Amino acid sequence: MSITLEEVLTSLRVVALPMKTKFRGISIRETALFRGDAGWAEFAPFVEYDPRECVPWLESAIEEATTNFDNQYRSTIAVNATVPASDDEVEIEKILSWYPGVDTVKIKVGTGIKEDLIRIARVRKILPSAKIRIDVNGSWKIDDAVFNIRTIYGEVAGNFLEYVEQPVATLDELRELKERLIVDVKIAGDEVLRKASNPFALDLSGAIDVLMLKVAPLGGIKRSLELAAHHKLPVVVSSALESAVGISHGLRLASAIEKLDYACGLATGALFEEDLATLPINNGAMSVNTPVIDDERLERFAATPERLEWWRNRITEVWKLRRRA
């Protein structure tokens, strides 16, 4: 199956989904949807991304619109809770209640070690047996990362600290960090992979222990599976804050990975006031299926005509950068 630019633009819908809590600094998630022979697809690069960085996101959406995938290894995916950079104990407890049955929590950190320790301690107070992941988004310098990871491990997390996601920005920094860390903590790589011009060319040895796979920024399910096979590391499938349409593509990726040892970060739909479809979390897991999009919600959350035109122009510009265009 294939799809043309004209077909994409003809079926294009843009929605603005309000969030229950700020995440990544935003309270409204704007995203574009279009239809192909295989159903709805999502194109959702954040608005600040330049056109070239958006190309793999468009390739993933085209794949979703034109390809039918069967569940290969599992029909349900264990997921983690996600706690934004909030220090309010009541809010943290409320956020965790949106993820029934999860036994793993990903916590955004990097706002300051004092605040980070408080946030992690509050999560552990509410879910004392949960595995903890912290996500730094590459914001620490090496010296800070060494100190902060040792401190977090020693004071609040201990062996419950499953891994630290992208603590520093570059591969060289990640290698140096692993050499200097005294505590036995795994390091996961996210931005270092998905922001690389050629992620297949990266030498990840001695730099990371876990590979984060985000289906849209990596160009789709097929390319993500190829990357996982190439780098031969344990993987976690995670979201890029998509609606249920994009999340379902991530769930299909997770179902296609033979060995999946970690809970996946695909439950971020819980952060929306309402999603375009219902993807429930049951006993800490989500089912792999094609969501039924609610037409009423498509209308209710429709973006303004000006924003629709902005996305039309964006898709047209990105389409021209595709290698097959």
Give the location of each predicted region.
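Active-site mouth loops of central-metabolism enzymes
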Residues: 17-24, 76-90, 108-110, 138-142, ...
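Short beta-strand elements
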Residues: 30-35
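Catalytic domains of carbohydrate-active enzymes, especially glycoside hydrolases
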Residues: 40-43, 95-110
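Catalytic core of soluble alpha/beta enzymes
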Residues: 107-110, 114-249, 254, 273-281
